[in-house]
A protein has these predicted regions:
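Walker B catalytic acidic pair
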Residues: 13
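Hydrophobic/aromatic beta-strand patches that form the interior of the parallel beta-sheet core
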Residues: 10, 48-50, 100-102
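Loop/turn-to-beta-strand initiation segments
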Residues: 5-8
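A glycine- and Lys/Arg-enriched "phosphate-lid" helix/loop adjacent to the NTP-binding pocket
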Residues: 18-86
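Conserved beta-strand edge residues that scaffold enzyme active sites
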Residues: 16-17, 106
Length: 129
C-alpha cells in the first residue's frame, strides 16, 4: 500500500537476502529461488539496494561483542559467512545500477555518512544524520 501511495519503503532485508542466504550460503537452487521471487514479486525491483560490506572476521567479531545471543545464521561457520558475503558482492556486481556496496569496516558515524552520501547520489535526496 505504501509503494502504491508513492511513499518510500525502507527494509533491512529483501529478496537479495534470500538469494544470498539460501542460494549462496546454503546452496539451494538459484533457479528455484528466482521462481519464488517471480511468483511473490513479479517484475518489482527496488530503486536502491545498499549492501553493507565488512570482512567476515570483522562481522563475526561484531556479533560476538554485542549483547544478545547470535541467531541461527550468525552461529554458522566461517565458510557459510564467506559464501554469504560473496553472494551479496556477486549480486551487486550483476546489478550495479541498483546495488551500492558501502564499506562498513568503520565506526558507525562514518558508515552512516557513507550511506547518506550514497542515497543522495543515487536518489537525488539529501538526508541529514
Amino acid at each position: 500500500p505504501a509503494l502504491r501511495a508513492g511513499d518510500w519503503v525502507i527494509c533491512d532485508r529483501f529478496a537479495d537476502s534470500t538469494r544470498a542466504y539460501q542460494g549462496y550460503g546454503l546452496g539451494l537452487s538459484m533457479d528455484a529461488i528466482e521462481t519464488l521471487y517471480q511468483i511473490a514479486l513479479g517484475d518489482f525491483v527496488p530503486d536502491l539496494t545498499i549492501i553493507l560490506d565488512v570482512p567476515v572476521e570483522t562481522g563475526m567479531k561484531r556479533i560476538h561483542d554485542r549483547d544478545g545471543d547470535p541467531d541461527r545464521y550468525e552461529r554458522m561457520d566461517i565458510g557459510f559467512h564467506e559464501r554469504l558475503r560473496q553472494g551479496f558482492l556477486d549480486i551487486a556486481g550483476h546489478e550495479p545500477g541498483r546495488c551500492a556496496i558501502i564499506d562498513a569496516d568503520a565506526d558507525i558515524d562514518t558508515v552512516t555518512a557513507r550511506i547518506f552520501g550514497c542515497v543522495t547520489q543515487r536518489l537525488g535526496v539529501s538526508l541529514q544524520p
